[in-house]
Amino acid sequence: MDAAQEVYGSQYPLVSRYVDILTTTAVEWGLMGPREAARVWDRHILNCAALSELIPVASSVVDVGSGAGLPGIPLALLRPDLQVTLMEPLLRRSIFLTETIKKLALVDRVQVVRARAEEHHQSYDVVLARAVAPLDRLIGWCNPLRATGGIILALKGESAADEVAAAKRQLESARLRAEVLTVRAHPDAEAATVVRLTARP
């Protein structure tokens, strides 16, 4: 795929290897459906890469409920300046993630933590969540992980604005401001809808 080659540059061979893992091992392990595997470049790899422009240089990043490693692994491949933690409570998925980062030679800057967000007591510059839960629940899980001055980025679909409206009480309680943003990794890639949460002034 030309767009992915342009976006990932010299890291493209490793991204291709990750795609191979997603479309074989991840499907076999039940971490990705066969239909999703057929759309992995657009729907997953480039969709996750679109977050990059919202992440400051040299950030510490946690991917909450990482599953098969999305969006954490594509971002780690795209951005060597990031230190990425993949947080996943389920043993099977944690094993998959640990084996995958070894295969992709990412062990020096990507770690796997087997835990639920509410059990993990560390803070990060950027907290990521993709297909984990509605925003009103995500706030309670993700905000305690956000360092002072940090941000939460939740990859959402068309329901983003509705989820922000439904989470009004939680946003006020956590003193967070929500912005619905549209970003894309490449002009030929599908747009991604992201809810960015930052501390209110």
Task: Give residue spans per PLM region.
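Class I SAM-dependent transferase core
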Residues: 1-62, 78, 92-105
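Short glycine-rich anion-binding loops that position phosphate/pyrophosphate groups of nucleotides
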Residues: 67, 131-134, 158
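Helix-to-beta-strand junctions that scaffold the AdoMet/dcAdoMet cofactor pocket
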Residues: 79, 146-148
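Conserved beta-strand signature within the Rossmann-like core of class I S-adenosyl-L-methionine
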Residues: 149-159
